Amino acid sequence: MKLDPNEKWSEEKDPRGYRQGDAIPEGDPVCIVPWTTICLSANGNIKPCCAYDADNDNKHFNFYYGDTLEDAHLGFEWLRKAFANQEKPAQCNQCWKNESTLSNSRRSWVYDKIKNKPKSYPVESPLKLKHMDLNFGNTCNLKCRHCGSWGSTNWFKEDIKLNDINKKFKRAVNHAKVRDVDPNYWIERQHYFEDMERIDFKGGEPFMQQGHYDVLKMLIDNGSAKNVELGYVTNGTKNPEELEELWPYFKRINLNISVETSKPGLYEYFRGGKIQNIDQLEQSIYWFDQFDNVNAHFSIAISTYTIFDLQELGDWIEQITSSTRSFKTLLANRTSDHKNRYEKPNNFNSVVSDPAYLDPNNMPPHMKQKVLNRWNKNYHNMEHLREAMLRTEYDPEQWELFKQYTKELDRIRGESVLDHIPELVGEL
C-alpha cells in the first residue's frame, strides 16, 4: 500500500491496528520520531533517527564533541514544530524518497514499532525515550561496497585512497578513525531507559562491540529487560555464545541479517573479502534460529551491484524461510491490501541513495531494461522498484562516477566486477 496522505489509516479500515506502510493517522504529526526516538550513529552523530541527514543541518550534535542527548533533543525543537505543522523538512528527504520508491519509510516504521505513543505532541517536549538507535562504534570485519569508514574500520585505507583519486566519490575520510563508546556512559544514565520499548543495535557490527553486551547486562540487572525489545542489523558473520545467556531475558529479539545477494562470488565481492561465503551465512542463520524469542528478517540494501540478481535473492530467501522457525515469513505473493498481507514480510525495503552513484535508479535506460528483463516474479515491492526505475531520469554524471568508482576500487582490491556481473561487460 503506497503511503498516501489522502488515505489515512483508521481503525475502521483495519481494526488490527497500524502497520508499517500505512499512512500516518490524521491528527498526528508528520513524524513522531523527535518525540519518541533518538539515534547515536557509529560516527558519534546524535540524530532524531538513522534516516535523518545531519550533513544538511545547520547545527551538528556529536557525542565525541561533548554534546549530550539532552542538547540534541532541545536542538530538535524546530523539527518537532515542523512536523506538528505538517511540514516535510529537507533533512528527512530519505523518507519522502523511500515512500515514492518503495511505499515505505523510517517514519512509518517508527510509528508501527512504538506502541505506547504520546497522548499529545507539544513542541517543547521533555526527553522521554521510547526507542533508541544505539551504535557503539564502527568496528566491523567487512568492507561492503556501499559502506565506508563511518561504518567499518576495514574501510579506512581504501577510503583515503579513493578520496585522493576523486573527491566526488564523497568518501568519509574524516571518519577514518576507530570509534568506541564507553558503555559506562549509558550505565551512568539508566534513566534514559525507564520508558524504553525497543533498542536497536547496528554498527559497525554490533556483535563485535563489548559495550552492547554491557548494556544488555545492565538492563537485565535493573529488571527492565522483560519489557524491552531488541533490534539488530548484523552481517551474520558472528554467533556469540554469550547471547545464549542474555537474550532469553528480553521480551523479543528482532534480528535483521544484512544480505544483498545470494550469488556465490558476487556475495564475497560485494562484502569485500573471503571472511564468509553464502553457504556459511546459511549456517549462521540456522544458529540464530535456535532462540525461542527471535523474530528474524533480512535487511536488503539494493544497489547497482546487486539489483541484477534481486529476483534470485528472493528465491534464496524463500528457500531459507521454508526451513527455519524464526524466519517463517514469506517474501513472495504478499499483496498490497490489508486483508491478505503477511504480518512480517521480508521485503525489498531499502535502496542505496547515498552515494547517489550506487543508486540503480541512476543507471541509463538500457541498463534498467536489462534488470527488468530478468524479473518475472512479483516479490513484494518489486512492482514499486520497477515503477521507480522507469520514472527516475537517468543521471549521466552519477553513472560515470559509478564506473570510475568500481574500476578504482577493483584495482585497489585486485578484483574485477566483470567476473561477477556480466551485465556490465562493455560498460566499464
Model-based region annotation:
Residues K2-Y18, A51-E99, D292-N295, H338-K344, ...:
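C-terminal accessory region of radical SAM enzymes
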Residues G211-K217, P240-W247, D309-L313:
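Distinct, well-ordered alpha-helical segments
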